[in-house]
């Protein structure tokens, strides 16, 4: 079992609860809260990308299930802005405590549960998830209570203000929305962290027909609240936590990610020279992972100054970007730093906090704002096909990885949409067994109409303004691995010849052969086919 730190200095948690009438809500024995959770309940948690999530109560629930042999008998429908730490939702999945899960996850056991059919999961654009949740789209079949509420919301906070508002920690996600729609609320105050007051800018989302434009034109604009109001009558408990976010040190930059980053930097330089980008570029959006980290690291070393960021998640390499003076300001919904990264943040807190805003994910990922500020989107997919369709979620067309996340809203609405991936990935028997450039993507999350630039370590394909056949040639020549380049080119040219004869040559395919890479991979452990 995970060791729970239930109680620190009484004066410490009291100092974080500025509204003294709420001190009566403090609970030191979390076992008292277990009966509030019933099989089939709709439970929501704060947190985003593995930070700022509640830990003490979810861990206590898992301990209770494990100790009493309740696996499969106490199952929740779980709603989180994105992913949370493995000691919470992934352990819940291991103990068969999750029935439904929306809209994004990251963990071995929860992924296995989804792909084995044990957990009902659907990914969703993160920008619209909160409003859809408020509208009741995800509680339509709720068998008890109101069809538009959560039974319980559990959120992490770093302070409760004098007027009873919640100051979150390292992420916002859907915390404002679940505080509005929950019947009961449990607040975990993490006293191992400093108060994050002043870092957030949170708004109450209005649903149509009452929605209005978000008055943001610059990444550092503020339109909301530093702390979010909560109905004190809904609060059933306040629990002290001293557990850190369970993050890890990212994979180090390697030769492949470095080459991808360099290709992108050179493209940016070219766009500046051609007058399509200003010298300080446009606001950057970067996904999560080693390649994304390498790209941001490469930009921080590049000839760019006075940059800004409009993204979902800020990672370790952004700290280097701040420290060398090239990054002016960053807006996100989550800070996902490694433990050393968080130490850097806290040791220079006053400097960093004046350069960062954390917003609702409904704001950080809003199509309206991504388009208005003119983002440069940078995301890592599973695969890209020769016409520019992108698969970000389902390998072999069927196996869910993590979910769509925010890639859809950024790739669809940014000024420039860039996807970057290694040209190949290894299998157990072949170091180049999987080509990330394929004839026809086995699952499509982002269409050919959304993508401008494709980058691998082999090169960069600028497909803006190109017809499908032109796109395919550029993608194969510039991005495919040399092993797969002739195989893909043969498929393209043969498909074109056949389709032109039949007057269907706009975007040529041979449907009897389009997925042969995948069948060969299943049968032989490699996409290196012998012949078409």
Curated annotation (Swiss-Prot):
Top-level lineage group: Eukaryota
Active-site positions on this chain: 312 (5-glutamyl coenzyme a thioester intermediate)
Subcellular compartments: Cytoplasm
Protein name as catalogued: Acetyl-CoA hydrolase
Family: Belongs to the acetyl-CoA hydrolase/transferase family.
A GO cellular component entry from the record: mitochondrion
The EC number(s) this enzyme carries: 3.1.2.1
Alphabetized Pfam families for the sequence: AcetylCoA_hyd_C, AcetylCoA_hydro
Residues that coordinate or bind CoA: 287-291, 402, 406
Keywords: Cytoplasm, Hydrolase
Gene Ontology biological process terms from the UniProt entry: acetate metabolic process
GO MF terms held by the record: acetate CoA-transferase activity; acetyl-CoA hydrolase activity
Enzyme class label: hydrolase
InterPro entries: AcetylCoA_hyd_C, AcetylCoA_hyd_C_sf, ActCoA_hydro, ActCoA_hydro_N, NagB/RpiA_transferase-like
Function statement: Presumably involved in regulating the intracellular acetyl-CoA pool for fatty acid and cholesterol synthesis and fatty acid oxidation.
Reaction equation(s) it catalyzes: acetyl-CoA + H2O = acetate + CoA + H(+)
């Amino acid at each position: 079992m995970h060791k729970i730190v239930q109680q620190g200095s009484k004066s410490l948690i009291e100092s974080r609860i500025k509204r003294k009438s709420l001190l009566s809500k403090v609970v030191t024995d979390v076992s008292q809260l277990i009966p509030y959770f019933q099989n089939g309940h709709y439970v929501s948690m704060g947190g985003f990308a593995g930070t700022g999530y509640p830990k003490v109560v979810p861990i206590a629930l898992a301990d209770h299930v494990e100790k009493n042999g309740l696996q499969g008998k106490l199952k929740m429908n779980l709603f989180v802005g994105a992913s949370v730490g493995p000691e919470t939702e992934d352990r819940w999945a291991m103990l068969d405590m999750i029935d439904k899960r929306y809209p994004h996850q990251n963990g071995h056991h929860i992924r296995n549960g989804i792909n084995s059919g044990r957990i009902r999961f659907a990914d969703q654009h993160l920008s619209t998830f909160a409003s859809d949740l408020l509208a009741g789209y995800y509680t339509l079949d709720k068998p008890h209570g109101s069809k538009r509420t959560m039974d319980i919301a559990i959120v992490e906070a770093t302070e409760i203000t004098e007027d009873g508002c919640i100051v979150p920690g390292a992420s916002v996600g859907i915390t404002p929305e679940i505080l509005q729609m929950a019947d009961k609320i449990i607040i975990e105050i993490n006293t191992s962290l400093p108060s994050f007051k002043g870092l957030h800018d949170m708004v109450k989302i209005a649903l149509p027909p009452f929605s209005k434009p978000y008055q943001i034109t610059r990444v550092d604009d503020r339109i909301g609240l530093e702390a979010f109001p909560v109905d004190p009558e809904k609060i059933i408990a306040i629990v002290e936590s001293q557990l850190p976010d369970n993050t890890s040190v990212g994979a180090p930059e390697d030769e492949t990610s470095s080459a991808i980053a360099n290709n992108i930097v050179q493209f940016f330089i070219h766009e500046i020279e051609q007058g399509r980008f200003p010298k300080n570029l446009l606001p950057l959006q970067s996904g999560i992972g080693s390649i994304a980290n390498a790209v941001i690291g490469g930009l921080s070393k590049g000839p760019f100054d006075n940059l800004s960021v409009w993204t979902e998640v800020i990672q370790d390499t952004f700290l280097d970007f701040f420290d060398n003076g090239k990054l002016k300001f960053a807006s996100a919904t989550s800070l996902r730093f490694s433990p050393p990264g968080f130490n850097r943040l806290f040791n220079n807190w006053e400097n960093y906090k004046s350069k960062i805003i954390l917003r609702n994910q409904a704001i950080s990922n809003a199509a309206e704002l991504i388009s208005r500020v003119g983002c440069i989107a940078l995301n890592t997919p599973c695969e890209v096909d020769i016409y520019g369709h992108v698969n970000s979620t389902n390998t072999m067309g069927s196996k869910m990885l993590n979910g769509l996340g925010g890639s859809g809203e950024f790739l669809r609405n940014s000024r420039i949409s860039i996807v970057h991936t290694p040209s190949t990935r290894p299998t157990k028997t072949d170091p180049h067994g999987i080509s990330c450039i394929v004839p026809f993507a086995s699952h499509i999350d982002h269409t050919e109409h959304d993508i401008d630039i494709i980058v691998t370590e082999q090169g960069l394909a600028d497909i803006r303004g190109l017809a499908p056949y032109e796109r395919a040639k550029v993608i194969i020549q510039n991005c495919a691995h040399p092993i797969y380049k002739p195989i893909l080119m043969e498929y393209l040219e043969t498909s074109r010849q056949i389709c032109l004869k039949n007057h269907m040559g706009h975007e040529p395919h041979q449907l009897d052969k389009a997925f042969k890479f995948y069948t060969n991979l299943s049968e032989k452990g490699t996409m290196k086919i012998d012949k078409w």
